[in-house]
Design a protein with these regions (language model features):
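A surface/extracellular/periplasmic glyco- and lipid-processing/surface-interacting theme
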Residues: 1-183
């Protein structure tokens, strides 16, 4: 009557396959991950530390000006940025042809590839897919069926990282465990 298509569910996400907010969050199966280190370049490094009390990943970044790693702070409330979900995706990133002087970067989203999903102090290796510009980004399980990853609700940070920096990416389990690195 008002021109609204009632068959469309406005609460169904088209971006990720989220666990419904009224269900218990799922526990990731890939192991513990209390520290995450994402290197984008020599001068751009992002870190996440799991805070079990808050149930969030706390974000910090390397600051050349400050001479070290500093908490990333929200200017609106002076609180350190914190995330329920951290998603790291690897793809080809290179200088856009003809724009070398401005260092304009081209990101190959059609590439698809490997990634990691972090939530609840845990990690799962994933794959991701994206076709044409009008197709959605899909996070899929690293299994033969490529089923959608069920992402827990909450604030999410997505890092798209150049394949050249994959060897510098790492995550660490709680104190007694050894480092795990991107494969």
């Amino acid at each position: 009557q008002f021109g609204y298509d009632s068959s469309i569910d406005p609460y169904k996400s088209t971006f990720f396959d989220f666990v419904p907010y009224n269900e218990e969050p799922r526990v990731l199966t890939g192991g513990d991950a209390s520290k995450i280190s994402v290197v984008h370049s020599a001068g751009y490094k992002t870190y996440f530390d799991w805070d079990a009390e808050q149930g969030k990943y706390m974000m910090s970044q390397y600051s050349k000006a400050a001479g070290g790693v500093q908490p990333s702070v929200d200017a609106n409330n002076d609180e350190q940025l914190k995330f329920d979900n951290v998603i790291v995706l690897f793809t080809d990133i290179h200088v856009f042809p003809g724009h070398e002087a401005k260092d304009l970067q081209e990101v190959d989203y059609k590439f698809g590839g490997l990634g990691y999903y972090f939530n609840g102090g845990r990690v799962e290796p994933i794959r991701w897919q994206k076709g044409a510009a009008d197709q959605v980004l899909r996070l899929v399980n690293d299994d033969a069926e490529l089923t959608n990853v069920k992402v827990n609700p909450g604030r999410s940070y997505i890092a798209v990282v150049d394949l050249d920096e994959a060897e510098n990416f790492s995550y660490t389990a709680a104190a007694a465990s050894a480092d795990s690195a991107a494969q």
